[in-house]
Amino acid sequence: MVMIVQPEPSTLAHYAVTAGNIPPIATQIYEGLVTYDWDQNPQPNLATSWEIAPDGKSITFKLREGVVFHNGKPFTSADVQFSFMEILKKYHPFAPLLLAELTGVDTPDEKTAVLLLANPAPYLMKALAGRDLPIMCKSVFEGTQILQNPSANKPIGTGPFKFGQWDRGQFVRLDRNDKYWKPGLPYLDHIIARFIPDAATRSAALETGEAHFAGYSAVNYADLARMKTNPLLDTTMKGYEMTPALSVLELNAKHPPLDKKEVRQAIAYAIDRKVILRDVMYGYGKPATGPLSSLFKTVGFYTDDVRNYDVPDRLEIANKLLDGAGLPRGANGMRFGMHLEVNSFGEQWLRQAEYLKQALAIVGIDLTLRSEDTATWLRRVYTDYDYDINEPFLSQGVDPVYGLNKQYLTSQIRKGVTFVNDSFYANPEFDNILNEAMREPDHGKRAVLYKKAQQILAEDCPLVWLIDVQYVSVFNRKLHDHTTGPLGTQQAFERAWLET
């Protein structure tokens, strides 16, 4: 089976880098303690059962018998302990959030692992799949420099597919794991992850049958209507239920005048999200109303009771805010200039950037678009902080601990870590609310706290929230059982099969 991954990842070190183009490959190789059903309830995987202590301060996992890593080493509780304490807690970009309460892992025997927590962590059971907290082989990493270990790009896991080959600029080949612990699986002999930079060529590969699957909107939204008329192809929006995402603008508050709330709010008012939805996303998604995806409505954490930037007199408001901030128009009609870093993950983001340039010019902000390769873009924004406005789309994970904490907590201003608080937002009141919500076991009380947090963010406007993203997968009709759960392409294709 050939799947398209766009763009090519810089590494397969899934435990240390969280870019969205890594999991479609890495989750074929690495597994987690649990997986999830369509209702997002945890189901057995490397763990067969678990018990949460009455005080919420420990979780005891019984581990599966007969599981071996791709190098032949048996899977034991020592691998769980090493993965959590020596790799994930130290190197995973989101460990300061997901594993903040983890103090240790007890291993009373080879098939029992006990996660010890300083405080209850109600979000943790939603983050134990291979996508978020994968389990690695202790013997591969022990005594080595974790980030320089060769298995970063030749990974060794317990999953249904083994790493085969990486031809840089072309493809990664994964081979069937003949010793996989699920009898008879996987069905496919190989998965080829192809890297095709050009959007038209990606679409052509699917239309001719050269490729069988493209997830995470690797196909341009503009091409989807044509794809739907092709008898070889079909599309689905399933498989993204645990991957809510927002298209946003990150505003560097270290670069005046973006340090002024009025300027950030003016930018938010200046943008017509309905135009982006129509002309860039071709109707897929919905206008974002605030800092959390509307997918969180199903669990009671989302609210639209926040400052509304999508109002009829938005341009008048934007101009008044900019005037009030002491930023008059010059002779050319512009108030000030800024650079916009264009998202490198697809051509639709360039189209969005071109619209943003037009929209902000109306209120006197002169945007210069800057497009670079993915590695340069990420380094410029998250390591060098050499940017004014950035145009990412941000995965919000399975809990507001992902969607809010990582993006807005003061503690998440972490130089060199991607997709965290690079806007330098710092609000002690907000921090206190999120830290309380993170440890609150009562769901209703958490919901009240998150509503307040969203209202504060919408007022402070550290980011501009554009589109509640709807991902789309395109697949060949001869490919079956490719999307079998709410993690979609970020879980293994163990049951996928191709008609001959």
What are these regions (language model features)?
Residues 473-500:
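Long beta-strand-rich cores associated with HINT superfamily self-processing modules
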Residues 3, 168, 297, 323-397, ...:
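Ligand/substrate-recognition segments at binding pockets and active sites
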Residues 277, 311, 366-378, 383-385, ...:
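Extracytoplasmic/peripheral linker and loop segments enriched in polar/acidic and small residues
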Residues 4-54, 85, 154-158:
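N-terminal lobe/hinge region of extracytoplasmic solute-binding protein
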Residues 287-325, 344-351:
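Structural transition elements
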Residues 104-105, 164-175, 192-255, 278, ...:
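Extracellular/periplasmic solute-recognition and catalytic clefts
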